[in-house]
A protein has these predicted regions:
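Gram-negative (and chloroplast) outer-membrane scaffold detector with strong preference
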Residues: 32, 37-105
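Outer-membrane beta-barrel "beta-signal"
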Residues: 62, 66, 168-182
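Extracellular loop and loop/strand-boundary signature of outer-membrane beta-barrel proteins
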Residues: 7-10, 47-54, 108-114, 161-166
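Outer-membrane beta-barrel proteins
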Residues: 10, 28-30, 66-72, 89, ...
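Transmembrane beta-strands of outer-membrane beta-barrel proteins
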Residues: 2-4, 34-36, 61, 77-83, ...
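Short sequence motifs at beta-strands and strand-loop junctions characteristic
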Residues: 14-16, 55-57, 112-121, 166-170
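Outer-membrane beta-barrel pore domains and translocons
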Residues: 5-9, 39-41, 68, 84-88, ...
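Short glycine/proline- and aromatic-enriched beta-strand/turn motifs that initiate or cap beta-hairpins
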Residues: 1-28, 177-182
């Protein structure tokens, strides 16, 4: 089955970050579902009070498995649990107006371009999906994310991690998927 998440593009339209994501899911006896998710995350954020701007865009990938929790495994509806391992390697830019040096006077530039970073994380997944018509299915998933490892650039934490979300924000996330069983 191939699917797309519809929340990410909507999030990108109404906020300063979001993502495009597609998934490939294999059905093993209506019980186990190995999953590969590939996406492209973007952020273009500005803080009005500090005038600091943050920008990134990069691909990310997740791999994992779901399992059907229902007793009747062959039903048109599925209740599933699972996990994912996620990874992204990305660059980001931080720009800001110069800072006034209080000791020596004058302006000191502040910002960085092309700061390299990477992130590894795990996700616990719980969700439902249902057959809508023919091969078309729709469903949602709720995700709890936990960072495993990270490499931040020389200027500290990035504002947004493609595929993971905002740093320092909620560890909770979700998807709303439209899937085509092939």
């Amino acid at each position: 089955a191939v699917g797309v998440d519809v929340i990410g593009p909507v999030q990108l339209m109404v906020s300063d970050y979001g993502q495009y994501e597609a998934s490939l899911r294999i059905n093993l006896k209506d019980k186990y579902y190995p999953v590969f998710e590939l996406g492209y995350g973007k952020a273009d954020a500005s803080d009005e009070s500090t005038k600091i701007n943050y920008k990134t865009s990069a691909p990310y990938a997740r791999i994992g498995i779901d399992w059907n929790l229902l007793k009747n495994k062959h039903d048109d509806y599925r209740l599933f649990g699972g996990f994912r391992y996620g990874f992204t390697s990305f660059k980001y830019d931080v720009t800001s107006p110069p800072i006034q040096d209080p000791i020596w006077g004058g302006d000191v530039p502040y910002g960085a371009e092309g700061v390299k970073s990477n992130y590894h994380w795990l996700e616990g997944v719980f969700g439902v999906d249902a057959k809508i018509w023919g091969p078309v299915r729709m469903g949602w998933s709720f995700r709890y994310k936990r960072r495993l490892a990270k490499k931040d650039g020389e200027i500290g934490n990035s504002y947004y991690v493609p595929g993971f979300g905002k740093q320092g924000g909620s560890r909770l996330g979700g998807t709303f998927n439209v899937t085509l069983e092939i």
